[in-house]
C-alpha cells in the first residue's frame, strides 16, 4: 500500500463478536489526518488486496463526510461493508450517493448515538444497523435477562434480531443481546465487567486450548506451532513461564520466552504439566473475546516493531504486549505479576514505566484500539514513526485474524 493513501488516514479497529464469541467482523474506523481529502479509491483497492476470504467481514466506518462520500462513490459490491454515521446524513449529496451505492449492491450499515434509530424512510437502504443503548435501555435489557423466559418475546426489548449492539456495558447485557435477542453481533466487548465477575472466582485456563496443545504434542507438530498455540492462551502462557522459572523445576537458566521454556522442559514434562491443568480448566465463552483482545495487542506490537529475522527479539516484543494486560486475568496488580518472572528491563520498562525501546510500540498498539485512535498521529510524530507503516501493519495483522 502506498503512503499516498495510508499516510493520509488515522485508523482504529474494533472487533464485532457473534453468538459463539468469535469475531464476526472487524470494524475499521477512519479519520482524515488533515483537512485535505484522502485518496479513498486507492485505499479501497488496497484493502481488497489485503483482505482474504478467511478474514472476518470488514466494516469500514468513515468518520468524516468527505471520506464517507469517497467510500460511497468508489466502493464495490465485493468490497467492505460501509457504515454510515447518522450525523453525516445531512451533508449535501450524501443521500443520493447512498442510494446509488445501494443500487450497485454495496452493503450499507447505519450507526447512531445512544437511543437513536434510523428514519423509517431511510431504513430500507441499510442491511444492518449498529445501535448504542441508553442507560435506560441497557437496564431494561438486563432486567429482561434476569426475569423473563428467553423464549418469551417482549415489546420492551431494546434489541431486535439481526442488530449490532455497540458499547454494551455488562456481561449480563452481552448475553442478553447474543443469546436471548439474536443480535448479529456485539461491537466491542465488556471485558472489564467479565473480569470483574471473577473477583471471587479466579479465571482459569481454556480447556479447549489445553486439549489442542495435547493433540499437537501427540501429532509431533513443529515446536513453532506449539509455541504459537500456547501464546494464544495468555493465562496458560503466564503459568508456564512461572513453572519453568520455579525452583522445583531445577532448570539451570532463567526462562524468558515460551520457546526457550519448551526446549528446556521437554515435551514429556510439558504434556504432564498440561494434564495437571485440566481439572481446573474451563470452557467459558465470554472469556474468549478477552483472550483474543490481549493476543491481538501482542501481535500488533510484534509486527509494529519489525524485528526482521531476529526471532528472539520478536518473541520478547510479543511477550511484552501479552503481559501488559495479564493483571486482569490474574486479578492482581500488574507489578506483582511481572515481578514473579525474570523479565528484561526492556519488558518491565515498557509495561510499568512506559520507557525503553518497546514502549512506543506498546503505546501505539493500545492506541489503535478504538476509541483511542485520536492518539495515533501524535504518537507517530513523537516517536518518529511513519503513519503509513503503522496503518499497513495494523491491516496486515487484522487480515490474519480467523473468524
Spans of model-derived segments:
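Generic structural signal for short, solvent-exposed loop/turn connectors between secondary structure elements
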Residues: 31-43, 113-118, 131-139, 219-220, ...
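Conserved alpha-helical "signature site"
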Residues: 55, 142-403
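Residue-level detector of functional hotspots within protein domains
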Residues: 2, 7-14, 44-46, 66-70, ...
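The catalytic core of metal-dependent phosphodiesterases that act on cyclic dinucleotides
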Residues: 74-192, 313-316
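Bacterial c-di-GMP phosphodiesterase EAL domain
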Residues: 1-81, 86-100, 289, 307
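Short, solvent-exposed coil/turn linker segments
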Residues: 15, 63, 69, 76, ...
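Generic structural hydrophobic/aromatic packing signal, biased to beta-strands
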Residues: 11, 28, 60, 82, ...
Amino acid at each position: 500500500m502506498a503512503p499516498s493513501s495510508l499516510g493520509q488516514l488515522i485508523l482504529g479497529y474494533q472487533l464485532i463478536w457473534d453468538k459463539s464469541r468469535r469475531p464476526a467482523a472487524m470494524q475499521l474506523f477512519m479519520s482524515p489526518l488533515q483537512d485535505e481529502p484522502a485518496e479513498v479509491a486507492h485505499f479501497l483497492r488496497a484493502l481488497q488486496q489485503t483482505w482474504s476470504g478467511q478474514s472476518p467481514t470488514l466494516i469500514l466506518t468513515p468518520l468524516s463526510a468527505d471520506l464517507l462520500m469517497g467510500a460511497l462513490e468508489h466502493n464495490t459490491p465485493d468490497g467492505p461493508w460501509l457504515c454510515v454515521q447518522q450525523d453525516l446524513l445531512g451533508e449535501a449529496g450524501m443521500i443520493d450517493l447512498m442510494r446509488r451505492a445501494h443500487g450497485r449492491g454495496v452493503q450499507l450499515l447505519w450507526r447512531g448515538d445512544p437511543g437513536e434509530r434510523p428514519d423509517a424512510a431511510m431504513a430500507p437502504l441499510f442491511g444492518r444497523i449498529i445501535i448504542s443503548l441508553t442507560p435506560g435501555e441497557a437496564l431494561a435489557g438486563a432486567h429482561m435477562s434476569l426475569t423473563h423466559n428467553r423464549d418469551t418475546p417482549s415489546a420492551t426489548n431494546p434489541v431486535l434480531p439481526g442488530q449490532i449492539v455497540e458499547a454494551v456495558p455488562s456481561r449480563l447485557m452481552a448475553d442478553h443481546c447474543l443469546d436471548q435477542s439474536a443480535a448479529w453481533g456485539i461491537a466491542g466487548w465488556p471485558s472489564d465487567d467479565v473480569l470483574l465477575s471473577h473477583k471471587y472466582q479466579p479465571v482459569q485456563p481454556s480447556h479447549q486450548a489445553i486439549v489442542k496443545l495435547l493433540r499437537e504434542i501427540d501429532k509431533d507438530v513443529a515446536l513453532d506451532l506449539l509455541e504459537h498455540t500456547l501464546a494464544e492462551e495468555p493465562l496458560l502462557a503466564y503459568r508456564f513461564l512461572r513453572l519453568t522459572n520455579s525452583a522445583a523445576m531445577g532448570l539451570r537458566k532463567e526462562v524468558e520466552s515460551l520457546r526457550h521454556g519448551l526446549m528446556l522442559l521437554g515435551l514429556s514434562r510439558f504434556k504432564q504439566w498440561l494434564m495437571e491443568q485440566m481439572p481446573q480448566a474451563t470452557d467459558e465463552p465470554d472469556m474468549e473475546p478477552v483472550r483474543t483482545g490481549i493476543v491481538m495487542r501482542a501481535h500488533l506490537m510484534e509486527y509494529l516493531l519489525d524485528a526482521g529475522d531476529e526471532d528472539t527479539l520478536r518473541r520478547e516484543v510479543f511477550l511484552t504486549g501479552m503481559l501488559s494486560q495479564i493483571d486482569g486475568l490474574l486479578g492482581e496488580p500488574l507489578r506483582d505479576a511481572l515481578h514473579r518472572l525474570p523479565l528484561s528491563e526492556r519488558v518491565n520498562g515498557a509495561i510499568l514505566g512506559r520507557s525503553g525501546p518497546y514502549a512506543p510500540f506498546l503505546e501505539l498498539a493500545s492506541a489503535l484500539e478504538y476509541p483511542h485512535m485520536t492518539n495515533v498521529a501524535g504518537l507517530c510524530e513523537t516517536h518518529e514513526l511513519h503513519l503509513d507503516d503503522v496503518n499497513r501493519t495494523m491491516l496486515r495483522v487484522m487480515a490474519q485474524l480467523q473468524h
